[in-house]
Amino acid sequence: VVADEAVSALDVSVRAQILNLFVDLRERLGLAYLFVSHDLGVIRFVSHRVAVMYLGRLAEVAPAGELFKQPLHPYTQALLAAIPAVGDGTTSIFDNPARLLEGELPNPIDLPRGCRFASRCPYRMPHCDEVEPALREAAPGHAVACHLYTEGGTT
């Protein structure tokens, strides 16, 4: 089942009911979902595996629990760092100092060579501007498209 922003326009109580229904149907009927959402809280609740995209390319694919605990791609890290943790709102759910993305968002009609995230990446290397990183397995079941996790990278 493909669910594209299936609960984004719903109020909180209806959203919770629909999400619980998705989970119940998945467990009872063995359904698989491709659940598209910009709401990472929803993704965390309904997903076993998560794929993060940036400007139409996969940045990272991992089991949901691992991705939310140990994101590898700088974009995924920034997304998670922007989600406030429950409490005073000064910390994020990802145990890393929250960092705002800087730099210009590339023009989606005239995309740059190399990594699409390079202009906003805090770890940008010269290689990033020239070569688009391939999606590679950095850990078992955890793939990332980032030069930090390839030969010559820092990790």
Language model features: what each stretch is:
Residues 2:
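Active-site beta3 strand of CheY-like receiver
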Residues 5-93:
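P-loop NTP-binding/switch modules centered on Walker-like glycine-rich loops
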